[in-house]
Every structure is written in C-alpha cells, then in structure tokens.
C-alpha cells in the first residue's frame, strides 16, 4: 500500500510505501538566512513530516543534499551532525547552480517506518 501525505501543488511532501517513508525535496521557509539557519529550518520541517508519518530522525537511512555553495558545506555539516548525533544516515552532497527562490540548500531523505 502507498500512502501519500502533505500534498502541495506539485508533489506530496511524504510518501509511505513498503515500510519506508520518502520525504521529497525540502527547502527553508526563510531563504534569506545563512546556510546553517536554512539547514536547521529544513531539518525541523523534516522532523515534523517524519513524526506525522509515525517515525523520527533516528530512522533516517539515506539523504541527498543539494547546495548552491560548497564553500559553506562546513556550516551545514555542523547543524547536520548536531541534529542526527550518532544516527547519521548515508548521504550524498551535490553542488548545484541554483535551487530557486534564494534557497542555499535542499534536502531529500528516506526513513524506515516505525
């Protein structure tokens, strides 16, 4: 069974299928702030999506991160490691030219349900 949650005009923020929760690309609400603050906001939003799906950040198994400025990666990494602690997921970080709307970072995660 597939369950789609939190519909937007172009996607569902979270999709549950076969014991996994897939969280689509998430950007910060305020894109005028630093990479670290955008990361903190995104991870807070993702935590909420995971909770709504009946899981949490300790169950995140993979992440794809897109950033517009790899020179700011250390700032993102500091917030990332603080958020996940000892439960760091597998991860890829990719530099991109533009994310639109002033976003510096976009995050996609996959978690285990439950």
Where are these regions (language model features)?
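Short, polar/acidic, helix-capping and beta-turn segments at strand->helix junctions
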Residues: 1-114
């Amino acid at each position: 069974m597939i369950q789609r949650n939190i519909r937007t005009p172009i996607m569902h923020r979270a999709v549950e299928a076969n014991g996994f929760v897939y969280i689509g690309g998430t950007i910060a609400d305020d894109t005028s702030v630093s990479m670290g603050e955008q990361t903190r906001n995104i991870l807070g939003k993702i935590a909420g999506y995971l909770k709504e799906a009946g899981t949490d950040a300790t169950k995140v198994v993979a992440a794809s991160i897109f950033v517009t400025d790899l020179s700011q990666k250390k700032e993102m990494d500091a917030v990332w490691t603080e958020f996940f602690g000892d439960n760091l997921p597998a991860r890829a970080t990719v530099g991109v030219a533009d994310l639109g709307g002033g976003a510096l970072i976009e995050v996609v995660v996959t978690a285990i349900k439950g």
